């Protein structure tokens, strides 16, 4: 149940991305609850045209549940960065609702009238401008979706419009429950290794890993892998992928990830991270500093615990992990305090 709406038997939420190079369009089709004409008026006509500044001012004091990132209105507003024209076709779940068609060419005027959609949900069609036509190519669309949305919690399918029955296929592009979102006790060694190979395209087995799982005082999950380092032949280059609610944000955000951890490979998902601020603001954000300190502490705890309870393994790995530990001690005083007895 969703309000008064009974979901159809076997219902599974999904988003279809449909490319059409001939028409130069990109469609996003969902099977969600749709919108009434009044909701289009509120969420599109009022929010999307209120201006980014007014929108941010309106929502700056909202709680995490109402954070700006991921909010439909602001995301929709940005569609005009790539599209000369945008159409919306939607049908609400509400009994007796009439389908709505809305269109705008990027100015302040729009047209809204009864639509012809027959299934509950929403379709947004972008008529791409000449500078970004690459995005209606299925290969480019697949590349972008896989980079940013490989672990989104709703299934995403990609297809090409007007394909023949023989050609027609929907390709699932994402995993809705990434390994880092599971409890560590539910994960097997093979799952950790498979995830490492898939995300980092590295087929050399890592030495070990740390599964971060924290709900208080902030929400943070992730997995950090210690790769095997051959100092003679390889440079020490790691990568830490930062996610927000399972959506990829960027690699190696040094304002969030302690510098010495850049030698590792891993993923960090922190929905509480403020994304509507500049990189320079992140440097001076006390909350971000707490996140960074927590990550550093968990790594130190893991290494200290390994030295105490798995001394033989710790000694075996020492040649590989010593550059990381020594670098961490130089860069982070608290890390150094915790690791002094284990060097």
Regions found by a protein language model. Give the residues of each.
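GHKL (Bergerat-fold) ATPase N-terminal catalytic module, capturing the glycine-rich phosphate-binding loop
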Residues: 1-135, 143, 150
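GHKL/Bergerat-fold ATPase module in large chromosome/replication-associated machines
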Residues: 68, 86-109, 129-132, 139-343
